[in-house]
Amino acid sequence: MSTPHWFDQGSLVLASNNKGKVAEFEKLFEQLKLPVEIIPQGRLNIPDAIEDGLSFIENAIIKARHASKISGKPAMADDSGICVPVLGGAPGIYSARYAGEHGDDAANNAKLLNDLLPFRKNGEVIEGMFVCVLALVTHAEDPLPQIFQGIWHGEILEAPRGENGFGYDPLFWLPELQVSSAELSKEEKNKISHRGQAMQLFRESLV
């Protein structure tokens, strides 16, 4: 594995204040065994960026540039969410604030279930997918952010299952495994999830 020049700084800021995401990323970076310190932006008192992009890619870049500008360090940001085709792709980029208040997982899950009620009259399977876009910038004005994308396909349950994970994990059903995402361990989830897929592409970019 080669070491990109930004490794020379010895640290990489993770542009997120979401505790669930931070925990997953710390585990993923631990598994990658990269010779660089990962610093969650909260440790540097960096506030959340204003996510006013219209796509996962735009918001990931916005967050990465924001963290890099304040910290003066390379930064990686994740923008992710769940997309449901019968809802036109919603919640999409608004996943974290689907019910109005940012980060209210219970309310977001309840709204998604309610919005899907009209589509369940005949017992139809509701397909959904988790999307993760990672953006890596070496500095705040980096003209060529690196982008890594992962997509995880599944179905949306009629009621929550499982106690692990965060966000919409309790509603995300994996038919091939017969479990919800919230019934997977961190290690199991990281091997197959949208975030795990994107991180694997990041790892491969270093080779």
UniProtKB/Swiss-Prot annotation:
It catalyses: XTP + H2O = XMP + diphosphate + H(+); dITP + H2O = dIMP + diphosphate + H(+); ITP + H2O = IMP + diphosphate + H(+). Its cofactor is Mg(2+). The keyword Magnesium applies. The active site is at residue 79. Mg(2+) binds at residue 79. Its EC number is 3.6.1.66. One of its GO terms (biological process) is purine nucleoside triphosphate catabolic process. Substrate binds at residues 16-21, 80, 166-169, 189, 194-195. Belongs to the HAM1 NTPase family. PANTHER family: INOSINE TRIPHOSPHATE PYROPHOSPHATASE, INOSINE TRIPHOSPHATE PYROPHOSPHATASE/HAM1 PROTEIN. Homodimer. This is dITP/XTP pyrophosphatase.
